[in-house]
């Protein structure tokens, strides 16, 4: 993947955010109100959200450990690519969160958005979503089989939905998070090819 495509993705994400500011509280808050119920059974959606960080940690560790035990250098190297995508994703997500500093929807609309819990960091982009899509995309790049790709992206998409259902994020936070995660995985793949080409 060319670096030009990565810059283009970043510009699209920024454009989405600033376009959203221009249209402010219209379609986005209406959609979020439809997704986020005032009285809900949060358990399933909460568990989906909570699955992100344990899976993100366990996946590359398991890949590396199995690769080490089986003396499988390829699998070990694939675990590095996953870690790379997660590190890039975390860096970009946090940089965007603190530079844009978007208010959480439940702070801006306390009478119409009902959060499961209140997060302390900024809203844009969704960190859970970006991390889920970084992992899903990285795994899909490594294992291009439908039985890997479909469950990975289904899980990542359900994480994004859960963040809105729980009242934690606007739809554009989730879309931007998905874009950042996908871009991070492809950037990690590209960097690995450049750094480790024989």
List PLM regions with ranges.
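Hydrophobic, lipid-facing residues on alpha-helical transmembrane segments of integral membrane proteins
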Residues: 83-95, 99, 175, 179, ...
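N-terminal transmembrane-helix/juxtamembrane module of multi-pass inner/ER membrane proteins
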Residues: 7, 16, 20-63, 67, ...
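Sec-dependent signal peptide recognition
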Residues: 4-12
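Transmembrane helix-loop junctions in multipass membrane proteins, especially transporters and channels
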Residues: 68-75, 101-106, 168-172, 193-198
């Amino acid at each position: 993947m060319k670096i030009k495509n990565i810059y283009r993705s970043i510009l699209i994400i920024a454009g989405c955010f600033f376009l959203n500011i221009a249209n402010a509280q219209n379609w986005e808050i209406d959609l979020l109100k439809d997704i986020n119920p005032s009285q809900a059974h949060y358990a399933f959606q909460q568990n989906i959200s909570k699955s992100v960080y344990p899976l993100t940690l366990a996946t590359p560790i398991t890949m590396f450990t199995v690769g080490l035990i089986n003396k499988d250098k390829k699998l070990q190297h694939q675990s590095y690519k996953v870690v790379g995508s997660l590190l890039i994703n975390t860096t970009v997500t946090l940089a965007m969160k603190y530079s844009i500093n978007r208010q959480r929807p439940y702070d801006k609309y306390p009478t119409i958005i009902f959060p499961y819990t209140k997060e302390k960091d900024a809203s844009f982009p969704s960190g859970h979503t970006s991390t889920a899509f970084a992992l899903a995309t990285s795994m899909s790049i490594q294992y291009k089989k439908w039985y890997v790709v479909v469950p990975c992206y289904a899980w990542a998409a359900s994480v994004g939905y859960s963040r809105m259902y729980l009242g934690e994020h606007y739809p554009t936070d989730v879309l931007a998070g998905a874009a950042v995660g996908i871009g991070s995985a492809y950037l990690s793949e590209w960097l690995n090819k450049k750094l480790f080409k024989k």
